[in-house]
């Protein structure tokens, strides 16, 4: 297999591409040769991500999209394919979290988490899948979380949504394998992004978090991006339906 990690000639759409893991993944896919449609709610930040890809010699477009609005997802896919070509790679990264005592979680809270973390993911997949099936190839990377495997107090909605992502990933993988489409889940642990970084600034919290991670550090967004490039590349063509934990060993620690 020549250049197994090259994405030359491929087009990717990345949701939640304005910052953190999503932005790092978008930049890495662009560096690997893919044209990238960067999607997020905040236009300024997502335009910045697209501009960074283009400044490095790649092709990119930015689209302001609320992924909980199905019509906006469909429009973004149509515009991206018109500008960059058929979508070969979908990275479902957009998501929100909620920490709250379960008895205080309102219906609106619950619906908001599930709408963003699960329903929007399904709609994005549904929007790009017909083209992938017709072409006989495609890569779908659903960004989950170690919280989909762990029982974490005060995170009932978030844990449930991410566990559902695992199930969705396996079902899609089983259904579409014969069409040359691989569907996998990238499940990060604590990463060096805004919320964990702020928590690490408090000495007591830092010690508590690091004590749960055998590697004794946070993961870096660039590490998640490197894994995403692998999952998007021909090197992973025989891998599908898997949830890959990038968590410094936290989910296997006793």
Question: Where in this protein do the model-derived segments appear?
Answer:
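Short C-terminal tail/terminal secondary-structure segment
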Residues: 2-4, 150, 229, 240-254
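Conserved glycine-rich cofactor-binding loop
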Residues: 11, 18-19
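Conserved glycine-rich Rossmann-like NAD(P)H-binding loop of the short-chain dehydrogenase/reductase
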Residues: 34-48
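Substrate-binding pocket helix/loop in short-chain dehydrogenase/reductase
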Residues: 101-102, 106-114, 209
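Active-site helix of classical SDR
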Residues: 125, 161, 169
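Alpha-helical segment proximal to the catalytic Tyr-Lys
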Residues: 130, 174-178, 237
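Residue(s) in the substrate-gating loop at a strand-loop-helix junction
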Residues: 145
